[in-house]
């Protein structure tokens, strides 16, 4: 994971060097399915920009997975390095890049008894954790070029897909009889959990924001 973070930071430094030569810079505040975020926008050429951003949002929800009710805490956290191509210098753009993906889902069930795998265990609950590939590719389209004007305010929108992998599930038994839960039942329950959330492999990204060019 550290190597991947260093790779993203190294690419970002290259973008910053190119932006310094181009002498174009802007910022964006945005809101979307990755949470609330801020981006620096760096002009590379008349048609290409680079963006370095950070997104974060936390919220709680209750969800039933494989007939087990969990109180879940969803933490969205990504660091993005994106390249925008504006054909003919237009506002429309194609976007590709990488995100350091810290998105994570964690939570717990009640400890009054439940079925783990195919076995019912009284006075048992489960703590759950779900995370994804540390480095995730992104592809999308969008509208808005903050660096097109001499300076001032603008609006932008992104629509795309973040491929974050199948997800890694860890379940830990809790409660008075936690020690009785067999590893085989835990492994079976983890597989069912992963099957239930397999659609999270492709995470839809939509955002809109306000930008300013200096």
Briefly describe each language-model feature range.
Residues 16-24:
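Sec/Tat signal peptide C-region and signal peptidase I cleavage site
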Residues 25, 48-50, 91-94, 153:
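Repeated loop/turn-to-beta-strand initiation elements of outer-membrane beta-barrel proteins
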Residues 27-42, 149, 200-202:
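Solvent-exposed loop/turn segments connecting transmembrane beta-strands
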Residues 29, 38-42, 81-85, 96, ...:
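Residues on the lipid-exposed face of transmembrane beta-strands in outer-membrane beta-barrel proteins
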Residues 31-35, 54-60, 87, 98-104, ...:
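Transmembrane beta-strands of outer-membrane beta-barrel pores
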Residues 54-81, 103-136, 165-205:
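Extracellular/periplasm-exposed beta-strand and loop segments of Gram-negative cell-envelope proteins
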Residues 84, 88, 152, 201-214:
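Outer-membrane beta-barrel "beta-signal"
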